[in-house]
Amino acid sequence: MILKEKYLKEVKSNLQKQFNYSSSMEIPRIEKVILNMTAGKEVTNAKAIEEVINELTLISGQKPYQTVAKKSLASWKLREGMPMGGKVTLRSKNMWIFLNKLINIAMPRIRDFRGVSPKAFDGRGNYSLGIKEQIIFPEIEFDKIRKIKGLDVIIVTSAKTNKEARALLEGIGIPFAKVEK
């Protein structure tokens, strides 16, 4: 819970000063973190779907729900309604534990890591992060996985603008890459 304490003690007051909010309820906060992982082209393999669910459970500490295909894709032998992967929404305590693990343990383990892209905001203060390898998380044992899969991390904030959201995420310790002009 170190990250939550940092947010409550330091980041909130810094954001209040930086953006001159009239009410403490206006200060942006992280509402939830959504993790999404698919089996990719192995969607026809039930074992691959099960592995995705198990890996998401290990990473998040919470049981994900199975995602299904919205449309049929002949090239992937995919039918509408077939299971594709898993998705989990983290809030409150689990969210802060995951963010702490992501920032302090997983991100430093990424090869040639120079920070996350500052362009991945959606215009409403939410941030999307793509992780190419699930093995950066300490819970995933390299010897036990069949295939390296990616993972989507969406950080949903109450910020109204990208600038506010970036200040919030930088405050809690997410390293953004330097943009060269």
From Swiss-Prot:
GO terms for biological process: translation. Signal peptide: none annotated. GO terms for molecular function: rRNA binding; structural constituent of ribosome; tRNA binding. It holds the Pfam family Ribosomal_L5. Keywords: Ribonucleoprotein, Ribosomal protein, RNA-binding, rRNA-binding, tRNA-binding. GO terms for cellular component: ribonucleoprotein complex; ribosome. InterPro entries: Ribosomal_uL5, Ribosomal_uL5_bac-type, Ribosomal_uL5_C, Ribosomal_uL5_dom_sf, Ribosomal_uL5_N. This is one of the proteins that bind and probably mediate the attachment of the 5S RNA into the large ribosomal subunit, where it forms part of the central protuberance. In the 70S ribosome it contacts protein S13 of the 30S subunit (bridge B1b), connecting the 2 subunits; this bridge is implicated in subunit movement. Contacts the P site tRNA; the 5S rRNA and some of its associated proteins might help stabilize positioning of ribosome-bound tRNAs. Part of the 50S ribosomal subunit; part of the 5S rRNA/L5/L18/L25 subcomplex. Contacts the 5S rRNA and the P site tRNA. Forms a bridge to the 30S subunit in the 70S ribosome. Belongs to the universal ribosomal protein uL5 family. This is Large ribosomal subunit protein uL5. It comes from Mycoplasmopsis pulmonis (strain UAB CTIP).
